């Protein structure tokens, strides 16, 4: 009887720990691309309360570094928790609070070697229903496997200014 109880407790604990990084399909991220595709979906929502911030947090190493463009002339470094808090604060913007926010990947380039990966994305971001056109940007993601699961180790971001395009170089043709 004690063994059965221990087994049930262990199974419950294991499923609780692993559920932190399940994609919408209900399976672990088998590829780094699945993780990156899902983070854009995960942060897009009608309001902050409908975002599963715990799920977003589970996508990052605890020590991950997030560097985002926070104004025209400034980038800010965040921890994963700071990144999430910045997003929660953004969702308090009255227009975002009423209409929601959406991000989507326009293009993606991936390099994987064993348990490490680099992914570059060109994305669009918009306040849903806004008269302003969507903003485009570039995210450069580094990932590594941890306990068999892909996790984000770092991301750095740059906004593509209106009317600008990426450099006309082979590395940016994706």
Where are the model-predicted features located?
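N-terminal, post-signal-peptide region of Sec/Tat-exported proteins
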Residues: 47-75
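Hydrophobic pocket/interface hotspot
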Residues: 39, 56, 64, 119, ...
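Short, surface-exposed coil-to-beta transition loops
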Residues: 103-105, 133-140
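Short, low-complexity N-terminal intrinsically disordered segments enriched in polar/charged residues
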Residues: 18-58, 172-174
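Short beta-strand edge/turn micro-motifs at domain boundaries
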Residues: 136-164
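Sec-exported extracytoplasmic/periplasmic mature domains
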Residues: 40-45, 61, 65, 88, ...
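Surface-exposed, charged secondary-structure patches
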Residues: 24, 66, 70, 75-129
């Amino acid at each position: 009887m004690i063994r059965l109880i221990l087994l049930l407790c262990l199974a419950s604990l294991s499923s609780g720990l692993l559920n932190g990084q399940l994609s919408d399909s209900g399976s672990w991220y088998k590829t780094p691309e699945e993780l990156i595709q899902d983070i854009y979906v995960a942060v897009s929502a009608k309001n902050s309360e409908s975002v599963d911030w715990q799920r977003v947090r589970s996508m990052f190493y605890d020590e991950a570094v997030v560097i985002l463009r926070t104004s025209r002339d400034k980038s800010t470094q965040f921890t994963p928790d700071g990144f999430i808090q910045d997003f929660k604060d953004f969702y308090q913007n009255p227009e975002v609070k009423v209409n929601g926010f959406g991000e989507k990947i326009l293009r993606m380039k991936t390099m994987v070697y064993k348990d490490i990966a680099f992914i570059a994305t060109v994305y669009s971001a918009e306040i849903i229903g806004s008269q302003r056109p969507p903003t485009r940007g570039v995210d450069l993601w580094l990932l590594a496997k941890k306990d068999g699961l892909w996790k984000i180790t770092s991301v750095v971001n740059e906004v593509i200014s209106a009317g600008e395009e990426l450099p006309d170089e082979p590395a940016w043709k994706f």
